Amino acid sequence: MNKVVLLCRPGFEKECAAEITDKAGQREIFGFARVKENAGYVIYECYQPDDGDKLIRELPFSSLIFARQWFVVGELLQHLPPEDRITPIVGMLQGVVEKGGELRVEVADTNESKELLKFCRKFTVPLRAALRDAGVLANYETPKRPVVHVFFIAPGCCYTGYSYSSNNSPFYMGIPRLKFPADAPSRSTLKLEEAFHVFIPADEWDERLANGMWAVDLGACPGGWTYQLVKRNMWVYSVDNGPMAQSLMDTGQVTWLREDGFKFRPTRSNISWMVCDMVEKPAKVAALMAQWLVNGWCRETIFNLKLPMKKRYEEVSHNLAYIQAQLDEHGINAQIQARQLYHDREEVTVHVRRIWAAVGGRRDER
């Protein structure tokens, strides 16, 4: 199995292809990407027969920006007979996966696939039973075994394969299903909530998103991101010349500072979180974020970088490299992750966590 399917946001196939070609090449896993505009997925075809499995095992999924999900697959199954679609699929998977832990029958996230998605949900139940009988799936769901993927690109036409549960997205189609809170000031609140799900392990939420923490929201108006921090019982400095939602001010947890987010300097020394969703050139935002991290003004940050019309992967890579270089120059160890989230549009969301300072005299951040 030498092909890897990567699901992405429709319209960003070229960026997804450029990224996987670059990062696979860095690991000497060579191949080429098949791209169809607005398809919502990319296929990276490796030159060596076993390199698909090697790629999804060795390249950390968390290092990918534009992929929502990935899995290795074999040849395309076409013209599945309507009276028995199950037998050919089981045949393709036998000998490839043994005792898989979960089945996901998926499609790309496009308008054209919505009808197909209804079929996938109905088809999952009988297919799961058949795969269990054949030994492809274990008799119970377990996160410790590979995930079996059946990916329909058209009626009667699918790829079959698998991903490793330790190196994939835990979400169906790579999309967390979040509900918009009725009392939130704007839909942008879902970006930050999704970022928490993607970047912070669930078992670390109580420690890293704790009650009573201090946080700063730069460019906060009307308060979509502040809302997420308030919901987790943090104290928030919301920085923006524009007004904040009164419902947030009424909580007593928000201090509204009518200032430019680029000029604001914190006076507290115990700020755990800084978040930022400002419409500005990505290089300018990256420079501001680096300044906050280098100066130790916050421990963790989540921010958005708005994307240009062209060379989006190159632009994001350049900005992330700049932040990394600034941290390295000042002896600061940090984890950097970036992802184009489901709720993002022409942007990517970045998470940086200071871990410790390698320079004497700096406070350990762990």
Swiss-Prot record:
Compartment(s): Cytoplasm
EC number: 2.1.1.186
Active-site residues, Swiss-Prot/TrEMBL: 306 (proton acceptor)
Signal peptide per UniProt: none
Catalytic activity from the UniProt record: cytidine(2498) in 23S rRNA + S-adenosyl-L-methionine = 2'-O-methylcytidine(2498) in 23S rRNA + S-adenosyl-L-homocysteine + H(+)
Binding site for S-adenosyl-L-methionine: 188, 221-224, 240, 260, 277
CC terms in the record's Gene Ontology section: cytoplasm
Gene3D superfamilies for this protein: 3.30.2300.20, 3.30.70.2810, Vaccinia Virus protein VP39
GO terms, biological process: methylation; rRNA processing
Keywords, sorted A to Z: Cytoplasm, Methyltransferase, rRNA processing, S-adenosyl-L-methionine, Transferase
Molecular function GO terms recorded: S-adenosylmethionine-dependent methyltransferase activity
Matching Pfam families: FtsJ, RlmM_FDX, RLMM_N
Protein task: Catalyzes the 2'-O-methylation at nucleotide C2498 in 23S rRNA.
PANTHER family associated with the record: RIBOSOMAL RNA LARGE SUBUNIT METHYLTRANSFERASE M (PTHR37524), RIBOSOMAL RNA METHYLTRANSFERASE FTSJ DOMAIN-CONTAINING PROTEIN (PTHR37524:SF2)
Family: Belongs to the class I-like SAM-binding methyltransferase superfamily. RNA methyltransferase RlmE family. RlmM subfamily.
Assembly with partners or alone: Monomer.
Protein known as: Ribosomal RNA large subunit methyltransferase M
Higher taxonomy: Bacteria, Pseudomonadati, Pseudomonadota, Gammaproteobacteria, Enterobacterales
